[in-house]
Amino acid sequence: MKKQIAILGSTGSIGTQALQVIEEQSDQYEAYVLTANNRVEELIAQARKFKPEAVVIANETKYAQLKEALADLPIKVYAGTDAICQIVEDSEIDIVLTAMVGYAGLKPTMNAIRARKPIALANKETLVVAGELINDMARLSGTPILPVDSEHSAVFQCLAGELGNPIEKVILTASGGPFRNCTMEQLATVTKAQALKHPNWDMGAKITIDSASMMNKGFEVIEAKWLFGVRPDQIEVVVHPQSIIHSMVQFEDGAVKAQLGMPDMRLPIQYAFSYPQRLKASFPRLDFKMCTNLTFEQPDTTRFRNLALAYEALHKGGNMPCIVNAANEVVVAAFLRDEISFLGMSDVIEKAMSIVSFVAKPEYEDYVATDAMTRRIAQELIKLNSTGIRVSQLPSSSEENKNSK
């Protein structure tokens, strides 16, 4: 029988590529549920092509348009974030691909885990925000979490067949983004258009900005801790501009395994769907005759502070990664609206880390409260920044930033 796939975020970059995988492997998979946040026209087109059992639009104001457009098809139509959380529990679903962007992916992922649905995890923010909670839930329910990020999929593939051999370190590769060789002066004047031009990968706007600022790599460091059970000091980032080696694992005997391939997200998506099998596919093949120059560099955390901030959050633990994620979501949205500078994003994130109340052992309600508080504070900091006030020079609130648990 064909596996029934629920794609949360089907109109985004990962979602559309997942549908390409389903189309190519139509004898193996079917799109059972498709969801989108706002892109109703794209969702309509996908629904008409793939004929899922159900579609969900998070923006309830788009429900009537979606319902009317699909009235001639036997497709169930729902709206609202609660509907997304509920649909993942459908007994017919075999795999849930969490391709939603940001914090919004947390609750649907939790519901899918409770329903014991295998998770193909593309929404890295779920583990960034609440990694310990998600890991505990997955362990107790016996729910597998299969990584879709190319770097974590690479590590996962490197670990296949190792039978628990101890890891010395995980080495995550980073392209370095479009500003790898820029000076601080040049970074200060980076525009939205420049930041949206990634040299190697085709991604959505938010993750492309995160890649340019190296926050994406910082999030991947946090994600790696929870996926592979390694300490922060066992996770190394190296800049590899060619994006051919997707990541590596070094074992305690010094041997290093690497996973290589063309920069194409369809491969890790398909591997998450098919694991432990590999399916024949038409993806572009790596031609080693063309790979004459594979280079590696140390990341510069002075110019790209977000990577250092992510490591700091991981070391501190508790709700600190949640604070970083919420502040980052706010500043990236502001940057895309031309309301804050490229370097100003790091200033706001760092200041939010020093202001928002720290919780050492958070529960789900603490993550919700942390996310809301951080977003409010980050918005206030952006407003101050727009008036010319140097956010980095503002005093921290020692009273608010206390260990509350």
Label the predicted regions.
Residues 1-405:
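Catalytic, metal-anchored helix/loop core of enzyme active sites in primary metabolism
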